[in-house]
């Protein structure tokens, strides 16, 4: 194992390097504040890279996650073995640093906060923001591993080896974070890294240990310079500024790291292309870059609850913002008027609309209503005449007319006896007195009765519920209230013998009885129009009868004249067309005349007397027989002709009758 001076250097060297780093870091911090205008702390590792071009930056020394891809393909198992050897030596070095308080005092006085800020920017590549809040021991181990990695390699191989180490650490830590979201935040880097170192120690080789021991001093000097510059810049920030600006520092640092990683990727790409790397390395490098960026964002999100535990107490959380109701937190619109209480006028309670009053001058009417005031709903058998009675203008009721009251009910037509009237007359002294035909009598038992002419009605008193019945006097188009009714009166007939009761029962009987809609009136005399029509009908029948008699008589006369004529004489041409001249006239008729004689002669021929006589007689008889046979042959045709003649006669007779009937109709 190398000596402590070889690893950390002497005190004189550290002081000289600290001065140089202080001057460089101060100028870098001024340039960073002027350029960005963001938080005072910024990203110290990035400021060192921008300000001091001669001094190597953290990215150049340790590399970026995006550079891991190319180095991993070329280094292989050598990088893993070197990394495990470096970690074993880093653990021994951390033990020595814990026992040496002088080294701690040489730095900014508080190594734990400085180590936290320093390692928050240097360790673990894309995920070093999430590891910035770990324990002091974990950060010191990261620092020592970084130093050992630098000493393991030459100047050309430093960047690749450091990239391999950081990518392995970031990938291992990302796997642990995805598996346990809650337990990963509580575990420190110190617990993870020893496990990895134990697994890799089994693969160590003695040759790699020797190479790492030779290369340590060169890298340790650079680490001391970077640590001293970072340690002196960090105390300048107060604790409160760190708490307030912690959230702002992380996104800025991550953005700047991505820029440097892009620049370094381009340089690595050029160097690897010179060495013959193909396009597959570029594709894998781009994928690794995207994965690291997403992991760094996820780690920064998970770190916020731990880092901001103090800021939550000072400034409150996001839940406190939406605690109030939407309606209460809404500020009033700029154009909307606001009342004294800060509420818009629309939300104020609407004021009641004042009553509309119209001033009108009307005369006041005072009426003497007496001591008692009663509300009366008159039945249909009572009525009141409001105008005074005057015999000159009195009009009696007509039975045919229907009398309707103010409510539309039909009044019983009792004429004078059921109407309350009043009149003005003068007494003996000449004073005007109001007189009525009705009066109310109050008996000793408290009951009352109404006497209207000769009729008596019982009066019943009942209280009224509520103040809904008022007495008004009409004043032009308005009404003037006078009193409120508290009691009401009802009237009923005193007995069934009264005329009013009889009228009521009769009216009910008339309503119940069915009236006959069709009435039959007796005929006092005969209608002259009907008699005239009947006389006309009789005359027409008589004329028709006379016409019939005349037609019958005419037919009888015609029949008598037509008896001597026959069809054989009227139509001689129908028979014997071969014969001509006078012989052709009615030959059939002549034959018919002698038919009877011929038959008699036949009887004589076949009689018993035929044997008697002379031979001459026999010869004559033969000749006659020959003639008869010839005549008999012609008889069938003659009979047929006779039948046709009879039919013709019959047809002719029918035709004549029809003519007569037509004449009769005419």
Swiss-Prot record:
Its main location: nucleus. The modification N-acetylalanine is found at residue 2. Residues 1-14, 179-192, 574-583 have a biased composition (Acidic residues). The modification Phosphotyrosine is found at residue 606. Keywords: Acetylation, Activator, Nucleus, Phosphoprotein, Transcription, Transcription regulation, Wnt signaling pathway. The modification Phosphothreonine is found at residues 188, 629. One of its GO terms (molecular function) is RNA polymerase II C-terminal domain phosphoserine binding. GO terms for biological process: endodermal cell fate commitment; mRNA 3'-end processing; negative regulation of myeloid cell differentiation; positive regulation of transcription by RNA polymerase II; positive regulation of transcription elongation by RNA polymerase II; stem cell population maintenance; transcription elongation by RNA polymerase II; Wnt signaling pathway. Component of the PAF1 complex, which consists of CDC73, PAF1, LEO1, CTR9, RTF1 and SKIC8. The PAF1 complex interacts with PHF5A. Interacts with TCEA1, SUPT5H and CTNNB1. Interacts with SETD5. (Microbial infection) The PAF1 complex interacts with Zika virus French Polynesia 10087PF/2013 non-structural protein 5/NS5. The interaction with viral NS5 proteins may reduce the antiviral immune response by inhibiting the recruitment of the PAF1 complex to interferon-stimulated genes, thus preventing their transcription. Belongs to the LEO1 family. This is RNA polymerase-associated protein LEO1. It comes from Homo sapiens. The gene is LEO1.
